[in-house]
Amino acid sequence: MIDIDRPKLEGSVAVGEGRRIGFAEFGSATGRAVFWLHGTPGARRQIPLEARTYAERNDIRIIGLDRPGVGSSTPYSYPNVLSFADDLATVADTLGIDRFAVIGLSGGGPYALAVARAMPERVVVTGILGGVAPTMGPDAIDGGAMVLGKFLAPMLPVIGAPIGRVLSSFVRVARPIAEPAIAIYGRLSPAADRELLQRPEFKAMFLDDLLNGGRKQMEAPFADVVVFARDWGFAVGDITGPVRWWHGDRDHIIPHTHGEHMVHLLPDAKLFTMAGESHLGGLGMAVDIITELMAVWDQEQPLIPR
């Protein structure tokens, strides 16, 4: 296992109603800001080491955010996906960030789109990596993991918390065997994801993220599923800013057709198909993804310094 540096800055921000949202910063403290929204499950450190190094060298400030119940974030149930945007806005204000890009991986995708919808004047560009699509309403599409999620969603407000507590307890007890557990998950994954999880730097990142995700981290994914299965609170087609979407054509969790569907709905979007890649493919292309988003930033806001 390789060594992994701590974030440049790590803490939490008060977002109202007695709640806090945890964050971790990587890269340059004065560079262009990129909010990175983790997958389901995940936490604030679920950011590839290559992306952190690239950000440091290219004057980019990456901020990973915990969702409610993860890390130092207060447990909370959003009424819909759009409600998350208020919390991110408060974090951005507190950290002195005006304009920014936002990246959402998998379950972070809906929240990234919500931020783009709620703050078009602040979000310069949005990147989605294998993002979840709506399951109800005019923007809905069937298939993938959310078929089961939609079925379970009505029960999760009751059973999700106790199941999550058991799983979180297992994570704490299993710290000495966390690395073998990640290896086992990799062996059960499709070839592309398995190869990524065998790379020492990604194994180290996932292990670090898992062990710093807090004592309730396994309850939070159930809250994600519940809110994903509802009306999101906005129409995908109302997002006016540029969106760049990366999706593996062998994604076994969120099918590639979901990416095609979402890009068709978005007014200003481009789909990058990752040939031969599965659900985690975007993590292995993090530098290319950030480079693309910064190029769009240059086109959209050429006078804003890095």
Label the predicted regions.
Residues 239, 245-247, 251:
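Short beta-strand/loop motif that positions the catalytic acidic residue
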Residues 49-50, 241, 255-264:
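Short alpha-helix in the alpha/beta-hydrolase fold that links the catalytic acid
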Residues 147-234:
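Alpha/beta-hydrolase
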Residues 19-72:
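Conserved HGGG/HGGXW glycine-rich cap/lid loop of the alpha/beta-hydrolase fold
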Residues 99-143:
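Conserved hydrolase catalytic core segment
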Residues 83-101:
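Conserved acidic catalytic loop of the alpha/beta-hydrolase fold
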Residues 268-306:
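Catalytic active-site module of serine/aspartate enzymes centered on a nucleophile-bearing elbow/loop
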